[in-house]
Amino acid sequence: MNLFDKKHLVTQADALPGRNTPMPIATLHAVNEHSMTNVPAGMEIAYFAMGCFWGVERLFWQLPGVYSTAAGYAGGYTPNPTYREVCSGQTGHAEAVRIVYDPAVIRYEQLLQTFWENHDPTQGMQQGNDHGTQYRSAIYPLTPEQNAAAHASRERFQSAMAAAGDHRPITTEIAHATPFYYAEDEHQQYLHKNPYGYCGIGGIGVCLPPDA
């Protein structure tokens, strides 16, 4: 694979080797002071990739029922990659967000609605002006129920796009969750720490129809 080819996913054989040591991050979420790693009893986890993770993380931490969020890397091969390595296209990872949520307050389907309505899922290996495999649109389900909901929502959103006159095919990857690696601490809750920082996400003006 061309080292500078960022429109095609690297193979596992060609991916960077990575490291055994996770990135050190703060113990508590900078916005709500909840644990960055623990999952309280009764709560569930969701993983989404929809472009630059700075804006994506903020989008989800603002939702009622979301306990914590974290920026990281998912869907690739390299263990515990650095931001620079992910941006090289040589890890296979997407910039992703880990969401710990209370299903008694917010359903997975509501998280999917936020996902579909707040980015462009047709752009392949980019999102807006951000180009590279790390910016691809992806859902990484953890359970058969999440997987079924993700696929059903993609079909509904594709139909809603067609009804709105947008016939571009959705390129969102839906694949069973592989290990999630936390990004460096400077990327965690980035837009809380840097309120005027870059946020490159935006929807296409189509709403996800409700599930039956």
Curated annotation (Swiss-Prot):
It is an enzyme of class 1 (oxidoreductase). GO terms for biological process: cellular response to oxidative stress; protein modification process. InterPro entries: Met_Sox_Rdtase_MsrA_dom, Met_Sox_Rdtase_MsrA_sf, MsrA_MetSO_reductase. Pfam families: PMSR (PF01625). Gene3D superfamilies: Peptide methionine sulphoxide reductase MsrA. One of its GO terms (molecular function) is peptide-methionine (S)-S-oxide reductase activity. Keywords: Oxidoreductase. One of its GO terms (cellular component) is cytoplasm. The active site is at C52. Its EC number is 1.8.4.11. It comes from the Bacteria. The keyword Oxidoreductase applies. NCBIfam families: msrA. Has an important function as a repair enzyme for proteins that have been inactivated by oxidation. Catalyzes the reversible oxidation-reduction of methionine sulfoxide in proteins to methionine. PANTHER family: MITOCHONDRIAL PEPTIDE METHIONINE SULFOXIDE REDUCTASE. Belongs to the MsrA Met sulfoxide reductase family. This is Peptide methionine sulfoxide reductase MsrA. The gene is msrA.
